[in-house]
Amino acid sequence: TLVHGAALTGGLLQAVSHATAKAGMFMAAGLIYAALGHDRIADMAGVARALPVTVLAFALAGIALMGVVPSGAYLAKKLLLDAAAGSGQWWWTIVLQGGAAFTAGYVVLVLASVLRGRAAAPPVIQRVSRRSEYATLVLAISSLLLACAALGPVPGALLSNPLAPLELGTTLL
């Protein structure tokens, strides 16, 4: 049925989107740790000045994990919420929206610390390669734009065919 197709598509899209965003976020955290020699959030003031590409990747991956448009997590969450509503399983709304709120909380906590001003950037004990920084950024951007790959440019695909995500789900069955 349409509801099961939406749930299947939403679940698969959630898995791929979450994996790419989380990989980008953990890679960014690893680069920050490698550069500073610690992972204490309270001591990260000025990191954005020292590692701007890495912090941008962390922020974009966090936005993707929150499920903001046009991320794959947004489309996945929409499909899963629609499927839950269609099958009377309203409690999934609490789980999905609670997860997004929790994600927003920890992403904002880290970003508030790394973006906090400081006269100078914190001491970098080891330089990280630009290639690693850009690989991290590519993962974050990929997750952020995953819904566009599934539907085409958003919101055009949704405006022309609001059932496009549901029809995509039924083709997978």
Report each predicted region and the residues it spans.
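Predominantly late transmembrane helices and immediately cytosolic-facing juxtamembrane segments
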Residues: 22-26, 90-132, 173
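Membrane-helix interface motif
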Residues: 65-80, 146-163
